[in-house]
């Protein structure tokens, strides 16, 4: 049930601590003429409702979450605690620089750390989501070409295994997308790349390791080809976790990168957000970076603005990005240190390769059996579907009954009936072994009880949804009652407490 379905007129009982002063000085013109259509429930009913919902949540705090290309790692509670210190929370974004030196120091150090681990010449912390970071990266590439009068470059090259945001970003920046194929080993087809590159090439967008879970073996040659043609290289930082502290995108030849803090640097995902995706640039793109950026000059931290970077592509937010998320990432990298970041990549690769080997032994088909998993890998159920009729979606739904979140399904699109599995570095061997056991059980069920798997899930609060009906008959908002309640109507009195 929705909270609105618990609502009863006049039931607005709640406890409230005494206030120092009533807000009686609000101008009449700013007051609502009708009361907001909020649910009217008792405090106890509200607490019970949301507690029940929280108990139905499936999250990284409750279960193993091997969602490929998402890096669902544990978020250390120390990061939350320190980022929520009163000194940070009470600071106004527009407070004078002189009163925010501690915060600015944290942001400056985060910029410097991200520069170091990515091999970039400069970093801006302002983008507020991965997709926005992508957009800014391609916008800087466009600004670079336009500053040189090189307006004939109208194409962005994108591999067929790329995230869907890559071509969308290129189109939003006014470019034509040129898709190139992947070879049988999961690498970008070099012949296709050479054929696609030319005087119209503005750049190449690449994720490395790719969404196929393998490292691009020819990345240095790809960089040479694109740069020789006058284009630039964009690095989608979605899978940076796999190479953190081991390989720097700047050393591979990339000119611009965005970093998903909710993946590599363990800030909360989704509803635990908001997001943040700093961008890093090579020297040639420094003049176009979004502002503000923190500078350290003469022993003082300060904001660099459009006055300092006149060719900047501009601002992305009212202030400087999602400060609370950036603080969490800063605490995370300080907790890890350089050695800890090395271990992140090592254990991400170790867990992925161990899990891949165990599932292969269990009878699952690996999409790229000759390649080492970088941090994730793909299982294809193409043959299983032909033999039993069980699809990747069926198996994913059945995993929910076993207490595991499903891996990413049907992505990348070029691998049929695929599961993209990423265990992340924070999972224990015992957790991975238990997951393998569950996968073995489901594999046996596909042979002995295929209908059980096809009709899953059976134990979740919500069963299988009608995807077609949901898409065609949208029901996205609560339909409020038509009666308006005016401010002059008699309301149920709320008890007050006098304090001596």
Curated annotation (Swiss-Prot):
Its cofactor is pyridoxal 5'-phosphate. Pfam families: Aminotran_5, GcvP2_C. Keywords: Oxidoreductase, Pyridoxal phosphate. Its EC number is 1.4.4.2. It catalyses: N(6)-[(R)-lipoyl]-L-lysyl-[glycine-cleavage complex H protein] + glycine + H(+) = N(6)-[(R)-S(8)-aminomethyldihydrolipoyl]-L-lysyl-[glycine-cleavage complex H protein] + CO2. The keyword Transmembrane helix does not apply. The keyword Oxidoreductase applies. GO terms for biological process: glycine decarboxylation via glycine cleavage system. Residues 1-25 are annotated as: Disordered. GO terms for cellular component: cytosol; glycine cleavage complex. The modification N6-(pyridoxal phosphate)lysine is found at residue 263. It comes from the Bacteria. One of its GO terms (molecular function) is glycine dehydrogenase (decarboxylating) activity. PANTHER family: GLYCINE DEHYDROGENASE (DECARBOXYLATING), MITOCHONDRIAL, GLYCINE DEHYDROGENASE, DECARBOXYLATING. Belongs to the GcvP family. C-terminal subunit subfamily. The glycine cleavage system catalyzes the degradation of glycine. The P protein binds the alpha-amino group of glycine through its pyridoxal phosphate cofactor; CO(2) is released and the remaining methylamine moiety is then transferred to the lipoamide cofactor of the H protein. The glycine cleavage system is composed of four proteins: P, T, L and H. In this organism, the P 'protein' is a heterodimer of two subunits. This is Probable glycine dehydrogenase (decarboxylating) subunit 2. It comes from Nitrosospira multiformis (strain ATCC 25196 / NCIMB 11849 / C 71).
């Amino acid at each position: 049930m929705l909270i609105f379905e618990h609502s009863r007129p006049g039931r607005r009982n709640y406890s409230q601590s005494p206030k120092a002063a009533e807000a009686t000085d609000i101008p009449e013109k700013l007051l609502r003429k009708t009361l907001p259509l909020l649910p009217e429930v008792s405090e106890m009913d509200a607490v019970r409702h949301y507690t029940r919902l929280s108990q139905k949540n499936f999250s990284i705090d409750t279960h193993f979450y091997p969602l490929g290309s998402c890096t669902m790692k544990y978020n250390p509670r120390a990061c939350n605690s320190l980022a929520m210190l009163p000194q940070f929370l009470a600071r106004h974004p527009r407070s004078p620089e002189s009163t925010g030196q501690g915060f600015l120091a944290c942001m400056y150090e985060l910029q410097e750390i991200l520069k170091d681990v990515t091999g970039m010449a400069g970093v801006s912390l302002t983008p507020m989501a991965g997709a926005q970071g992508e957009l800014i990266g391609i916008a800087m590439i466009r600004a670079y070409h336009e500053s040189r009068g090189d307006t004939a470059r109208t194409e962005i090259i994108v591999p067929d295994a790329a995230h869907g945001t890559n071509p969308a970003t290129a189109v939003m920046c006014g470019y034509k997308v040129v898709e190139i194929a992947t070879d049988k080993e999961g690498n970008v087809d070099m012949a296709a790349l050479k054929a696609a590159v030319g005087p119209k090439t503005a750049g190449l967008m690449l994720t490395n390791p790719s969404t196929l879970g393998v490292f691009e073996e020819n990345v240095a040659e790809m960089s040479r080809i694109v740069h020789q043609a006058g284009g630039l290289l964009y690095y989608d930082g979605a899978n940076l976790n796999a190479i953190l502290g081991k390989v720097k995108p700047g050393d591979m030849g990339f000119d611009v990168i965005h970093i998903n803090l909710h993946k590599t640097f363990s800030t909360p995902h989704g509803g635990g957000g908001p997001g943040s995706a700093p961008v890093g640039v090579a020297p040639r793109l420094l003049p176009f970076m979004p502002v503000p950026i923190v500078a350290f000059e003469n022993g003082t931290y300060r904001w660099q603005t459009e006055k300092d970077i006149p060719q900047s592509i501009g601002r992305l937010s009212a202030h400087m990005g999602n400060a609370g998320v950036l603080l969490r990432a800063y605490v995370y990298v300080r907790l890890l240190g350089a050695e800890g970041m090395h271990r992140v990549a090592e254990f991400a690769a170790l867990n992925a390769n161990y899990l891949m080997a165990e599932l292969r032994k269990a009878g699952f088909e690996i999409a790229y059996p000759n390649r080492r998993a970088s941090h994730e890998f793909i299982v294809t159920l193409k043959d299983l579907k032909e033999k039993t009729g069980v699809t990747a979606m069926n198996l994913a739904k059945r995993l929910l009954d076993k207490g595991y979140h499903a891996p990413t399904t049907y992505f990348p699109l070029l691998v049929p009936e695929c599961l993209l599995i990423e265990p992340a570095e924070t999972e224990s061997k015992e957790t991975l072994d238990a997951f393998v056991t569950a996968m073995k059980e489901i594999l046996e069920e596909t042979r002995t009880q295929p209908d059980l798997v096809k009709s899953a899930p059976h134990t979740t609060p919500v069963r299988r949804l009608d995807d077609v009906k949901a898409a065609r008959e949208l029901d996205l908002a609560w339909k409020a009652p038509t009666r308006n309640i005016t401010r002059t109507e008699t309301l149920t009195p709320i008890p007050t407490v006098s304090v001596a």
